[in-house]
Amino acid sequence: MEGVAPLKKRTQRAINANRRRLLREAYERYPEYACCDPEEFNWHEAEARLNVFDLYYLADSGYLDVTRGSAGVHRTPDFYMLTPQGADLIEIPGLLAERLPLRKREREERKS
């Protein structure tokens, strides 16, 4: 796709850290929508594209509700808000570590 920044390779830790950040920002603003700054959420810069990718991943997983704008052929987010499933992920002890672990040990502790 012309004009679209490639997705750069990330570690699972980096992916989960960014997704946790987005969830926490939504949690802090609930029940209001968080605004998607076009400089932070766009298809043309590598870091901003990662934010778009992670935001839609969380939305498709049921943790965030995203209002979608239109930018030609690309889904572009305008606002996002935490869903009840997203709140559970933050509030239920151990659930965030199970779903989006930052360390291998977090997942192992949850299993035992």
Task: Go through each PLM region and give its residues.
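Clustered cysteine/histidine zinc-coordinating segments, centered on FYVE zinc fingers that bind PI3P
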Residues: M1-L7, F53, R68, K104
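Short alpha-helical segments that sit at the start of domains
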Residues: E2-R29
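Generic structural signal for hydrophobic core residues of well-folded globular domains
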Residues: A26, Y30, I90-P93
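Short acidic, hydrophobic short linear motifs in intrinsically disordered regions
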Residues: P31-A46
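Short amphipathic alpha-helical interaction segments
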Residues: H44-V66, P77
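Short loop/turn motifs at secondary-structure junctions and domain boundaries
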Residues: A71-G72
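Short, amphipathic alpha-helical interaction segments positioned at domain boundaries
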Residues: P77-K111
